[in-house]
């Protein structure tokens, strides 16, 4: 069985004059507005954001083209992402910001070629030289993921040079390097100092400081930080997305003593104006049943569904998949998960398991492979384990020791429980000729994902922090 494989700018000045004339004549009533689009996006109103961005993008506004393309990339739909790349390319002819976004997309694009990675490096370097500091972090991530393409580049040396110039994004790149190297915990003091300095310029520092204090168990500093975060959010200086991410830190038991009560209070404050928080609230109840009951969870999810939040469909699918809160119903689970799959990699993992395990009455091996491959390449380590099991066990499918070995190795590298035992069984049955073939396929799969892909798969999204033009200020 073959391994499945994933599948001229208008004159801006002319449109500016036209739009200005219309605005003067009509008093701006009903006209598309980029500020409204951004505000709608921040509160999770995707329909309003998209309609405003689309109208402005059609008139050739580069910033609106970038905003619309960002939404299309975030959708997870391959057809929408192809449209996004086209928009980025149009805007990149005049906008350094668009060049940075195009480079960032090509760096993170699933199945991107070496030529696309090199184009990404060129675009990001060019945008950075033109004063677009947001290009710095994705450029470092690109070097970290594909070191074989730039053997002459030492990421740490580059970061040191940029930090010597006082660039805030260089400090952020250093934090990312610590994360990918697994040395974050050894640098908590430095990270705290850096993020106190740049807190008012990089909103991601709220997340980093909350993480530091959670890992240190410093309840007093955490309390002060949360008070400041609430004030900054109410003043419009911090988006709801960042408050949501801080609540996630508070609820994460792997970082230290979790505080689900405070996390819930934070999320309930922002949910009415930031609908994605309804899903985070439901997930909090899922993980901490003492915080509420099924009726409350479903109420949260209903609010999220009403706001067209795909993560709500993911969590509903999971509810009916595992039967933890509601009776198991694989068909309901499948229906919800299919709605979420375009933008939520976890949904593909659960769909793959439904098809692999025969939860719908029989095994659907090709459907299982298709969804598990998507999940695995999006950073879901458990999907690699499931693929290794599928091809080694041969349930409803011809066993394939080579494929089983490839995904078993990937699962072991990500420290998936029981993966070593499974890989040992696979290796014992693998003749030398097949082992050589498997090693080649493994190398190809690793290169397609990039080095450190699991650690960096979401960095280009979660660390895209805006820079506010203010002087650095300590807490």
UniProtKB/Swiss-Prot annotation:
GO biological process, alphabetically ordered: alginic acid biosynthetic process
Source organism, top-level taxon: Bacteria
One annotated Gene Ontology cellular component of this protein: cell outer membrane
Lipid-linked residues (S-diacylglycerol cysteine): 28
Subcellular location: Cell outer membrane
Keywords: Alginate biosynthesis, Cell outer membrane, Lipoprotein, Membrane, Palmitate, Signal
Major localisation: membrane
Function field: May be involved in the polymerization of mannuronate to alginate.
Protein name in the entry: Alginate biosynthesis protein AlgK
The species this protein was found in: Pseudomonas aeruginosa (strain ATCC 15692 / DSM 22644 / CIP 104116 / JCM 14847 / LMG 12228 / 1C / PRS 101 / PAO1)
Native organism taxonomy: Bacteria, Pseudomonadati, Pseudomonadota, Gammaproteobacteria, Pseudomonadales
Encoding gene, per UniProt annotation: algK
